[in-house]
């Protein structure tokens, strides 16, 4: 229960009450079956009401849930014969980004994604999913390899952002991100990017120059975190909830703005509730997108990607 979120409190309280009644019903002579059934119907309505009316801040909390599935979780369910590749051939390996070659329904692909840790030790090893330059350069090495051998590229995005430490800056963090944007724009193979959790700033963009970009229903994508925006705008990070509502960071917002190409439904309560069911939803999206993009020629893929990003941010003054 420690990982449950504030907006779920009414649901948890009712679930607890139902559990207590069921336990009592098993040991008592009093039949509480009807009362339990009524409460379960009430619970279903309450869950439907709360989960269908989540605010941007609620979704941000779900996107950051410590049990939210990671890139490796999805790789294990979506792909066959995955072989992880390591290192950028310049400085070293970065565990905050994982990637390798695999097959998707018989199609050879390259899979790359941010990787958060599952516990404190793992998070320290993976730097909480915040890549150093060598992580982005490893990703680019794998992309160039995919481009050379004609393998589609599938990227999973889930990071607070690129690591802002001194060592990362000394090794060329901004150049590494910019290089990925530049090189990805000219890849001759299909690129599908999926935001599975938090899409934070340039760290997310470095895997986000795709022919098609999708977001999980409760994922977020923004130039800065709500806490950071609140600290800058109002000098008060505690106003993060207000900032989240103003920033338009949700999957619905990004789709409405024309930045993403679709929203992948999440299981009720968030992807962490049922990994297998959530992987199946992602599977449907990748299948449809991959088959559509593989019908494009190399020139069409490059042109489509260019036109997609050229349109972002365009507006007319009336």
From Swiss-Prot:
Recorded superkingdom: Bacteria
Catalytic activity: N(6)-carboxybiotinyl-L-lysyl-[protein] + acetyl-CoA = N(6)-biotinyl-L-lysyl-[protein] + malonyl-CoA
Matching InterPro entries: Acetyl_CoA_COase_a_su, ClpP/crotonase-like_dom_sf, COA_CT_C
Gene name in the database record: accA
Main localization, broad class: cytoplasm
Organism in which the protein naturally occurs: Listeria monocytogenes serovar 1/2a (strain ATCC BAA-679 / EGD-e)
Subcellular localization(s) per the UniProt record: Cytoplasm
Keyword tags: ATP-binding, Cytoplasm, Fatty acid biosynthesis, Fatty acid metabolism, Lipid biosynthesis, Lipid metabolism, Nucleotide-binding, Transferase
Annotated protein name in UniProt: Acetyl-coenzyme A carboxylase carboxyl transferase subunit alpha
A molecular function (GO) term: ATP binding
Alphabetical GO biological process terms: fatty acid biosynthetic process; malonyl-CoA biosynthetic process
């Amino acid at each position: 229960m420690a990982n449950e979120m504030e907006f779920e409190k009414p649901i948890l309280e009712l679930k607890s009450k139902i559990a207590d009644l069921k336990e009592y019903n098993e040991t008592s002579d009093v039949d509480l079956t009807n009362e339990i059934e009524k409460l379960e119907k009430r619970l279903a309505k309450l869950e439907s009401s709360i989960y269908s009316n989540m605010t941007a801040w609620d979704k941000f909390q779900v996107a950051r849930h410590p049990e939210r599935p990671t890139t490796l979780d999805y790789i294990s369910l979506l792909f066959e014969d995955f072989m992880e590749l390591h290192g950028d051939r310049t400085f070293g390996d970065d565990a905050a980004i994982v990637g390798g070659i695999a097959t998707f329904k018989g199609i050879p692909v390259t899979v790359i994604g941010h990787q958060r840790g599952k516990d404190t030790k793992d998070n320290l090893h993976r730097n909480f999913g915040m890549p150093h330059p060598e992580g982005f350069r490893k990703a680019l090495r794998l992309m160039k390899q995919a481009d050379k051998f004609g393998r589609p590229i599938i990227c999973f995005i889930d990071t607070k952002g690129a690591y802002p430490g001194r060592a990362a800056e000394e090794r060329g963090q901004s150049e590494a991100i910019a290089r990925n944007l530049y090189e990805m724009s000219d890849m001759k193979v299909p690129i599908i990017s999926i935001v599975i959790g938090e899409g934070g700033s340039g760290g997310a963009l470095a895997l986000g120059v795709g022919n098609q970009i999708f977001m999980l229903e409760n994922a977020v994508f923004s130039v800065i975190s709500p806490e950071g925006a609140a600290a800058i705008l109002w000098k008060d990070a505690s106003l993060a909830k207000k900032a989240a509502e103003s920033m338009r960071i949700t999957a619905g917002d990004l789709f409405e703005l024309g930045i993403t190409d679709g929203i992948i439904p999440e299981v009720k309560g968030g992807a962490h509730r049922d990994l297998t069911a959530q992987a199946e939803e992602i599977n449907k999206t990748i299948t449809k997108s991959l088959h559509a993009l593989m019908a494009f020629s190399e020139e069409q893929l490059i042109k489509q990607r260019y036109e997609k990003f050229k349109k972002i941010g365009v507006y007319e003054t009336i």
